[in-house]
Every structure is written in structure tokens, then in C-alpha cells.
Amino acid sequence: MKIKMKFFSIFAVVAIMLSFAFSTLDRKIIVIDAGHGGIDFGASVENKTEKEIVAKIARKIQVLNLSSKVEIVLLRNGDSKMDLAERAAEVSKINPDLLISLHVNTSTNAAKNGIEAYVYDKSNFYEQSLEIAKGLVKAISNENLSEGKIQNARFFILRKAECPAVILEIGYLSNTENREYISSDSGQSVVAGRILEFINK
């Protein structure tokens, strides 16, 4: 009886370890890079700052994630300044399945509005990045954020990423309607929820 109990105990431990190993292998790691931070405020209009808005959206994405198959890693957790080289090095160390860098736009044209995205067309992951960018822009756009274009760009974080990578420009602070929406708790929750919903597809 003791031998049988010992056998079943060992079997149970092995089964748990194998289950954990396979669940870890199946898990996607998504890095969310909240742009700017610290003394770098990014875009700023009427006391609304880019660094604060994107940090709040990033945190909401992490908090809302209940999937065991997706791990959300925040590149900037808190109001700290990280230069581009530090960000790229940290992303490389994490080795994620996807990098999403969150930003907010601004323009001298106050009528300009909506969500846009950037990808790097010389990346080994260009096709994947482009499809992800299209999907994210479509998923987030609504009556408050119009569906904007996808552009190619040589931004440092995109050039250095060794995985699919997208920069999201979530609305225009210079546009009154966009500013009110993306600076509100409800608007940020909707944006975060739609990003997460797309990731979990």
C-alpha cells in the first residue's frame, strides 16, 4: 500500500511539473512600452501629458488580463525615465512574442484625430507587425477615435526589436474630443480592453 501511495505521489508531482512546463511554453509574452516617463512628458496639452495617459493604459492592460496564456510585461512600471537604448536592451532581454509601444499624438491642426500606427518595413517581422498594426488600429477605433493609417518608420525601438513590433499613436491631445476621451478613466479602460481583446485572439 505504501509503495502504491509513493508511486501515485511521484506520478502526481511529475504530472504537475509537466503541466506547468507545457503551460509556460504555450504562454505568449507581450511587452507593453508606455512611451516617455520621468522628466520626459512627451506631448502635453492643458495639463494632460502623454507619459501619464499611456502609463495608465498600460497598467489597465496588465490588470485586465486574466488569461493564463498571456503574460503582460510593462517596460516602464511607474514614472521613471528610460532612454531608447535602455528600452531596447530590456526588450531584448525579455525576448517577447510582441512589443506594443504606446504613444499619444499631437498636431498644429486641431481637427486631426484618431489612432495611427507605425511599423518598420526592413524588420524580419515586418509582415507580422503590419498585420498586427492593422488589427490593433481597427480594434481600438470607434466613434471617439477614428481609424487612421499605418505608416513605415525607422524609430529606434522598432529597428532594434527582435520580434513583431508596433508603435500605437492613441489619439491626438491637440484634438478636444480625442483629448477628453483618452484622458478619461472610461476611455482608457475601453482602449486597454480592446488592445487586450486583440492580443488574446
Task: Enumerate the language-model features and the residues they cover.
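N-terminal secretory signal peptides that target proteins for export/translocation
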Residues: M1-I3
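Bacterial Sec-dependent signal peptides at the C-terminal "C-region" and cleavage site
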Residues: M5, I10-K28
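Catalytic-core regions of hydrolytic enzymes
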Residues: L25-K134
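Active-site-adjacent mobile loop/cap segments within catalytic or ligand-binding domains
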Residues: V31-D33, G42, S101, N105-N109, ...
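Conserved beta-strand segments of alpha/beta enzyme cores
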Residues: E71-V73, E116, S146-K149, P164
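Active-site-adjacent substrate-binding region
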Residues: E127-Q151
